[in-house]
Amino acid sequence: MSWTAERYQNYIAELKSQGDAKYREFTEKVVSTKYPIIGLRMPFLKKEAKKISRDDLESFLSCVRSDTYEEVLLEALVIANITDLDTYLSYFDSFLDKIDNWAVCDTLVSSSKIMSKERNCFFRKGRILIRSKEPFVARVGFVIFLTHCVTGHYPKQMFPLITHYQSDSYYVGMAIAWLLSVLLIDFYDETKVYLEENHLSKFILQKTVSKACDSYRLSKEQKDELRALKKRLIH
């Protein structure tokens, strides 16, 4: 059944009636966003997105509004379920301006299975996005890299992109550190050599080593090497 403005309005009213005040308060502490928060958990929103995607996905997206944080999250999850590349890219590009927090950014990218299936396309897309002056658009690019492109020939291409990226955004810096910590797991030697070249800010290097040392997939010897590297480079 197609979505209409009235059906959508009634649907959102029902969602709002299911909001959890305590979960809303928790979300407000960990997500900084301009959108009012209802207090709905991610597993519930994912189930709703699946239902919508089986129903009439495009008519839903024609009605969707951005009045609450959960509506934006739900839109991201529905877009992530699109399987046709051209259709996906159309909605993806239009959605980027709505992203104002790490949770929506990471949800969109991590839920979009099409990005792994069309890896070349989205690696190119990521290279474009990281040039954006909008921090959460740039973060989308780096999260695409770490979620879908830590494989094959892509990592070697990432290092100069990281070096040339210029921003003091906390959320982009954290995404870069996250990316490098993931690269250390599967491409330890190459990534360690890159870290030793000392192109990174003190903040990103510290966060990279911290995240890497939290991983159970690196050996004690590797973690000791990274800690020593950090100590040597940060004066």
Name each model-derived stretch.
Residues M1-H235:
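Alpha-helical scaffold domains
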